Amino acid sequence: MKNPLIGGVRFYQRFISPGLPARCRYYPTCSQYMIDAIHTHGSVKGTTMGVARILRCHPFVKGGIDYVPLKFRLTKNPDETYHGPYTYRRNKKTEVEKDG
């Protein structure tokens, strides 16, 4: 694991989260979303997206499916299509950049 930010999230997932009641209103969970966002968009943008996701995960929101978008955005991803694991998204991201 090269990224210390991902290491911090993994620590939370492994040692802190199991002691807390399940309360994330989205799928994937906010912690997994942050890991995927860091993998997809890098440390700064990925962490920013992860924090934005945590801030919109509260009891007054409906929740639902919210995968990491291929393009950087801080709001809920309107495209609920799963773009596959990180390696697939990375290839898809390259294709999107070529098209646009």
Swiss-Prot record:
Transmembrane segments: none
Top-level lineage group: Bacteria
Alphabetic keyword roster: Cell membrane, Membrane
InterPro entries in the cross-refs: Membr_insert_effic_factor_YidD
GO cellular component, one term: plasma membrane
Subcellular location: Cell membrane
Short name of one Pfam family: YidD
Membrane topology: Peripheral membrane protein
The protein's role, per its UniProt record: Could be involved in insertion of integral membrane proteins into the membrane.
HAMAP family in the record: UPF0161_YidD (MF_00386)
Family: Belongs to the UPF0161 family.
Protein name: Putative membrane protein insertion efficiency factor
